[in-house]
Protein backbone atom coordinates (compact mmCIF):
# COMPACT_ATOMS: atom_id res chain seq x y z
CA UNK A 1 0.00 0.00 0.00
CA UNK A 2 1.37 3.42 -0.96
CA UNK A 3 2.19 5.89 1.81
CA UNK A 4 -0.03 8.92 2.11
CA UNK A 5 1.52 12.17 0.91
CA UNK A 6 1.61 15.48 2.80
CA UNK A 7 2.63 18.87 1.41
CA UNK A 8 4.04 21.14 4.14
CA UNK A 9 3.98 24.84 3.12
CA UNK A 10 6.05 27.05 5.44
CA UNK A 11 6.11 30.85 5.57
CA UNK A 12 9.49 31.56 7.25
CA UNK A 13 8.62 35.24 7.74
CA UNK A 14 5.55 34.56 9.85
CA UNK A 15 5.46 36.55 13.07
CA UNK A 16 6.32 33.85 15.60
CA UNK A 17 8.69 31.78 13.44
CA UNK A 18 11.90 32.41 15.37
CA UNK A 19 13.27 28.92 14.64
CA UNK A 20 12.34 26.16 12.23
CA UNK A 21 13.23 23.48 14.80
CA UNK A 22 9.63 23.08 16.11
CA UNK A 23 8.50 22.51 12.52
CA UNK A 24 10.90 19.57 12.25
CA UNK A 25 9.11 18.08 15.27
CA UNK A 26 5.77 18.54 13.49
CA UNK A 27 7.15 16.95 10.31
CA UNK A 28 8.34 13.96 12.35
CA UNK A 29 4.83 13.53 13.77
CA UNK A 30 3.36 13.53 10.27
CA UNK A 31 5.95 10.96 9.20
CA UNK A 32 5.18 8.73 12.19
CA UNK A 33 1.50 8.88 11.17
CA UNK A 34 2.40 7.33 7.82
CA UNK A 35 2.82 10.39 5.58
CA UNK A 36 5.57 11.09 3.10
CA UNK A 37 6.32 14.75 3.85
CA UNK A 38 7.39 17.29 1.21
CA UNK A 39 8.35 20.75 2.52
CA UNK A 40 8.13 23.97 0.52
CA UNK A 41 9.16 27.39 1.91
CA UNK A 42 7.44 30.46 0.49
CA UNK A 43 9.58 33.35 -0.76
CA UNK A 44 6.97 35.85 -1.93
CA UNK A 45 3.35 36.88 -1.42
CA UNK A 46 0.90 34.58 -3.17
CA UNK A 47 3.28 31.63 -3.39
CA UNK A 48 1.26 29.52 -0.94
CA UNK A 49 -1.70 29.82 -3.33
CA UNK A 50 0.48 28.78 -6.27
CA UNK A 51 1.89 25.78 -4.41
CA UNK A 52 -1.46 24.59 -3.06
CA UNK A 53 -3.17 24.86 -6.43
CA UNK A 54 -0.44 23.30 -8.55
CA UNK A 55 0.75 20.57 -6.18
CA UNK A 56 -2.34 20.00 -4.04
CA UNK A 57 -4.00 17.35 -6.25
CA UNK A 58 -0.90 15.16 -5.86
CA UNK A 59 -1.19 15.11 -2.05
CA UNK A 60 -3.62 13.75 0.52
CA UNK A 61 -3.03 16.64 2.94
CA UNK A 62 -1.76 20.22 2.57
CA UNK A 63 -0.42 21.72 5.81
CA UNK A 64 0.49 25.40 6.05
CA UNK A 65 2.49 27.18 8.72
CA UNK A 66 2.24 30.96 9.09
CA UNK A 67 -0.33 33.59 9.97
CA UNK A 68 -3.92 33.94 8.84
CA UNK A 69 -2.67 35.41 5.56
CA UNK A 70 -0.73 32.23 4.80
CA UNK A 71 -3.82 30.19 5.61
CA UNK A 72 -5.88 32.41 3.31
CA UNK A 73 -3.42 31.94 0.46
CA UNK A 74 -3.32 28.18 0.96
CA UNK A 75 -7.10 27.81 1.08
CA UNK A 76 -7.47 29.96 -2.05
CA UNK A 77 -5.17 27.54 -3.85
CA UNK A 78 -7.00 24.46 -2.58
CA UNK A 79 -10.41 25.90 -3.48
CA UNK A 80 -9.31 26.23 -7.11
CA UNK A 81 -9.00 22.44 -7.24
CA UNK A 82 -12.18 20.58 -8.26
CA UNK A 83 -13.98 19.49 -5.11
CA UNK A 84 -13.54 15.77 -5.71
CA UNK A 85 -9.74 16.19 -5.91
CA UNK A 86 -9.23 18.63 -3.03
CA UNK A 87 -6.77 17.49 -0.38
CA UNK A 88 -7.41 17.82 3.32
CA UNK A 89 -6.00 21.01 4.86
CA UNK A 90 -4.28 21.52 8.20
CA UNK A 91 -2.91 24.64 9.86
CA UNK A 92 0.00 25.31 12.20
CA UNK A 93 -0.47 28.93 13.35
CA UNK A 94 2.69 31.00 13.48
CA UNK A 95 1.63 34.57 12.72
CA UNK A 96 1.41 37.69 14.85
CA UNK A 97 -2.38 37.32 15.01
CA UNK A 98 -4.09 33.99 14.55
CA UNK A 99 -7.83 34.60 14.81
CA UNK A 100 -8.83 31.43 13.02
CA UNK A 101 -6.66 29.30 15.30
CA UNK A 102 -8.08 31.06 18.36
CA UNK A 103 -11.62 30.31 17.20
CA UNK A 104 -10.91 26.60 16.81
CA UNK A 105 -8.49 26.20 19.73
CA UNK A 106 -5.56 25.21 17.52
CA UNK A 107 -2.37 25.17 19.58
CA UNK A 108 0.40 27.63 18.73
CA UNK A 109 2.88 24.84 19.48
CA UNK A 110 3.54 23.13 16.12
CA UNK A 111 4.07 19.68 17.63
CA UNK A 112 0.87 19.87 19.70
CA UNK A 113 -1.13 21.14 16.72
CA UNK A 114 0.28 18.41 14.46
CA UNK A 115 -0.42 15.70 17.03
CA UNK A 116 -4.00 16.91 17.43
CA UNK A 117 -4.54 16.98 13.66
CA UNK A 118 -3.30 13.40 13.33
CA UNK A 119 -5.44 12.19 16.25
CA UNK A 120 -8.82 13.83 15.65
CA UNK A 121 -11.35 13.22 12.90
CA UNK A 122 -11.25 15.70 9.98
CA UNK A 123 -13.86 18.44 10.17
CA UNK A 124 -15.80 20.08 7.36
CA UNK A 125 -15.89 23.89 7.40
CA UNK A 126 -17.68 26.57 5.39
CA UNK A 127 -15.62 28.79 3.08
CA UNK A 128 -16.50 32.33 2.04
CA UNK A 129 -16.53 33.69 -1.48
CA UNK A 130 -15.81 37.42 -1.97
CA UNK A 131 -16.09 38.14 -5.66
CA UNK A 132 -13.50 35.85 -7.23
CA UNK A 133 -11.56 35.28 -4.01
CA UNK A 134 -12.13 32.99 -1.06
CA UNK A 135 -11.82 33.75 2.62
CA UNK A 136 -11.70 31.44 5.60
CA UNK A 137 -13.05 33.46 8.48
CA UNK A 138 -13.63 37.17 7.76
CA UNK A 139 -14.15 39.81 5.09
CA UNK A 140 -14.21 43.31 6.56
CA UNK A 141 -14.05 47.02 5.76
CA UNK A 142 -13.73 50.27 7.68
CA UNK A 143 -12.19 50.98 11.09
CA UNK A 144 -9.11 48.85 11.91
CA UNK A 145 -9.39 47.15 8.49
CA UNK A 146 -6.61 49.17 6.84
CA UNK A 147 -4.42 48.45 9.86
CA UNK A 148 -4.25 44.73 9.09
CA UNK A 149 -2.34 45.27 5.86
CA UNK A 150 -0.49 48.57 6.52
CA UNK A 151 1.29 47.74 9.78
CA UNK A 152 4.85 46.67 8.81
CA UNK A 153 5.53 42.94 9.23
CA UNK A 154 8.39 43.53 11.69
CA UNK A 155 6.07 45.56 13.95
CA UNK A 156 3.37 42.88 13.75
CA UNK A 157 5.95 40.27 14.71
CA UNK A 158 6.94 42.13 17.88
CA UNK A 159 3.65 43.55 19.09
CA UNK A 160 0.99 41.24 17.63
CA UNK A 161 -2.56 42.40 18.40
CA UNK A 162 -1.24 45.53 20.12
CA UNK A 163 0.25 46.71 16.82
CA UNK A 164 -3.20 46.64 15.24
CA UNK A 165 -4.70 48.54 18.16
CA UNK A 166 -1.97 51.20 18.09
CA UNK A 167 -2.34 51.86 14.40
CA UNK A 168 -6.13 51.78 14.56
CA UNK A 169 -6.32 54.22 17.47
CA UNK A 170 -3.85 56.52 15.72
CA UNK A 171 -6.32 56.79 12.83
CA UNK A 172 -9.53 57.19 14.84
CA UNK A 173 -9.71 60.92 14.22
CA UNK A 174 -9.57 60.34 10.48
CA UNK A 175 -12.20 57.60 10.31
CA UNK A 176 -14.34 58.07 7.25
CA UNK A 177 -17.80 56.51 7.10
CA UNK A 178 -18.67 54.52 4.01
CA UNK A 179 -21.97 54.96 2.24
CA UNK A 180 -23.21 51.50 1.31
CA UNK A 181 -26.28 49.55 0.37
CA UNK A 182 -26.02 46.08 1.82
CA UNK A 183 -28.54 43.38 1.00
CA UNK A 184 -28.34 40.39 3.32
CA UNK A 185 -30.63 37.48 2.48
CA UNK A 186 -33.14 39.97 1.06
CA UNK A 187 -32.96 42.43 3.99
CA UNK A 188 -31.66 45.86 2.91
CA UNK A 189 -29.42 48.14 4.99
CA UNK A 190 -28.78 51.46 3.25
CA UNK A 191 -26.67 53.94 5.19
CA UNK A 192 -23.25 55.05 6.40
CA UNK A 193 -21.06 52.60 8.26
CA UNK A 194 -17.80 52.87 10.20
CA UNK A 195 -17.10 49.15 10.09
CA UNK A 196 -18.52 45.98 8.63
CA UNK A 197 -17.59 42.31 8.77
CA UNK A 198 -18.90 39.08 7.35
CA UNK A 199 -17.28 36.45 9.51
CA UNK A 200 -17.16 32.79 10.44
CA UNK A 201 -15.06 33.20 13.56
CA UNK A 202 -15.29 34.00 17.25
CA UNK A 203 -12.37 36.45 16.97
CA UNK A 204 -11.89 39.33 14.51
CA UNK A 205 -8.45 40.98 14.50
CA UNK A 206 -8.10 39.88 18.11
CA UNK A 207 -10.22 42.90 19.04
CA UNK A 208 -13.83 41.81 18.60
CA UNK A 209 -15.09 38.59 20.15
CA UNK A 210 -18.25 36.60 19.50
CA UNK A 211 -19.39 33.87 21.87
CA UNK A 212 -18.90 30.25 20.72
CA UNK A 213 -22.66 29.79 21.08
CA UNK A 214 -23.19 32.46 18.41
CA UNK A 215 -20.90 30.99 15.76
CA UNK A 216 -21.06 27.66 13.95
CA UNK A 217 -18.33 26.87 11.42
CA UNK A 218 -20.33 24.43 9.30
CA UNK A 219 -23.92 25.68 9.24
CA UNK A 220 -23.82 27.39 5.85
CA UNK A 221 -24.18 30.82 7.46
CA UNK A 222 -21.96 33.78 8.23
CA UNK A 223 -22.31 36.38 10.95
CA UNK A 224 -22.84 39.90 9.56
CA UNK A 225 -21.81 42.78 11.82
CA UNK A 226 -22.32 46.41 10.79
CA UNK A 227 -21.42 49.50 12.82
CA UNK A 228 -23.57 52.43 11.62
CA UNK A 229 -22.44 56.01 12.12
CA UNK A 230 -24.02 57.12 15.42
CA UNK A 231 -26.22 60.18 14.81
CA UNK A 232 -27.18 61.03 18.39
CA UNK A 233 -25.47 60.99 21.80
CA UNK A 234 -27.73 58.09 22.76
CA UNK A 235 -26.66 56.13 19.67
CA UNK A 236 -23.01 56.83 20.43
CA UNK A 237 -23.48 55.64 24.01
CA UNK A 238 -25.21 52.45 22.82
CA UNK A 239 -22.36 51.78 20.40
CA UNK A 240 -19.64 52.33 23.02
CA UNK A 241 -21.42 50.10 25.55
CA UNK A 242 -21.87 47.35 22.96
CA UNK A 243 -18.17 47.43 22.08
CA UNK A 244 -17.04 47.52 25.71
CA UNK A 245 -19.40 44.72 26.75
CA UNK A 246 -18.84 42.74 23.53
CA UNK A 247 -22.61 42.57 23.20
CA UNK A 248 -22.89 42.72 19.42
CA UNK A 249 -26.06 40.67 19.07
CA UNK A 250 -28.46 42.68 21.24
CA UNK A 251 -27.41 46.30 20.79
CA UNK A 252 -29.43 49.04 19.11
CA UNK A 253 -26.13 50.64 18.08
CA UNK A 254 -25.11 47.69 15.90
CA UNK A 255 -26.59 45.48 13.19
CA UNK A 256 -26.03 41.75 13.64
CA UNK A 257 -27.46 38.96 11.49
CA UNK A 258 -26.83 35.34 10.53
CA UNK A 259 -26.73 35.33 6.72
CA UNK A 260 -26.00 33.15 3.69
CA UNK A 261 -25.59 35.75 0.96
CA UNK A 262 -24.62 39.43 0.99
CA UNK A 263 -24.46 42.01 -1.79
CA UNK A 264 -22.52 45.22 -1.09
CA UNK A 265 -23.08 48.21 -3.38
CA UNK A 266 -21.12 51.47 -3.18
CA UNK A 267 -20.41 54.52 -5.30
CA UNK A 268 -16.66 53.90 -5.01
CA UNK A 269 -14.29 51.03 -4.44
CA UNK A 270 -13.95 50.38 -0.71
CA UNK A 271 -10.74 48.62 0.35
CA UNK A 272 -11.41 45.46 2.32
CA UNK A 273 -9.45 42.71 3.98
CA UNK A 274 -9.97 38.98 3.55
CA UNK A 275 -8.47 37.15 6.53
CA UNK A 276 -6.21 40.18 6.94
CA UNK A 277 -5.14 40.24 3.28
CA UNK A 278 -5.78 43.37 1.20
CA UNK A 279 -8.54 43.48 -1.41
CA UNK A 280 -9.09 46.68 -3.44
CA UNK A 281 -12.86 46.28 -3.40
CA UNK A 282 -15.34 47.08 -6.16
CA UNK A 283 -18.59 49.07 -6.53
CA UNK A 284 -20.54 45.79 -6.45
CA UNK A 285 -19.42 42.70 -4.55
CA UNK A 286 -21.25 39.41 -4.14
CA UNK A 287 -20.36 37.56 -0.95
CA UNK A 288 -21.44 33.95 -0.66
CA UNK A 289 -20.58 30.74 1.10
CA UNK A 290 -19.62 27.24 0.03
CA UNK A 291 -21.10 25.10 2.76
CA UNK A 292 -18.62 22.48 4.00
CA UNK A 293 -16.33 23.47 1.13
CA UNK A 294 -13.16 22.61 3.04
CA UNK A 295 -12.19 19.57 5.08
CA UNK A 296 -9.61 20.33 7.75
CA UNK A 297 -7.52 18.27 10.11
CA UNK A 298 -7.58 20.20 13.36
Predicted region positions:
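ATP/NTP phosphate-donor binding region
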Residues: 1-65, 72
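Catalytic core of DAGKc-family lipid kinases
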Residues: 33, 42, 81-198
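Short Gly/Thr/Asp-enriched flexible loops that form oxyanion-binding sites at enzyme active sites
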Residues: 70-83
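Short hydrophobic-aromatic micro-motifs
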Residues: 133-140, 145-146, 190-200, 204-205, ...
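Gly/Ser/Thr-rich active-site loops/lids in small-molecule metabolic enzymes
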Residues: 155-163, 203-207, 212-234
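A generic structural signal for short beta-strands and their flanking turns/coil linkers
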Residues: 176-178, 192-194, 218-223, 258-260
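ATP/nucleoside-binding phosphotransfer catalytic cores, i.e., glycine-rich phosphate-binding loops
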Residues: 184, 216, 226-298
Amino acid sequence: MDDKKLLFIVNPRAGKTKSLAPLFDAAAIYSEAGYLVSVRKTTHRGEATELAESLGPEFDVVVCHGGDGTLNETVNGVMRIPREYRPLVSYLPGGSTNDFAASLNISSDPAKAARSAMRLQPRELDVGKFGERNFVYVASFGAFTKTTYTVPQDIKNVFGHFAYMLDGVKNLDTLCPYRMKITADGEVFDGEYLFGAISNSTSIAGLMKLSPETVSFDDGEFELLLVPVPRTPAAMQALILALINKDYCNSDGLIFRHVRHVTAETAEDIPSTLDGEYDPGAPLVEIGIEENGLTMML
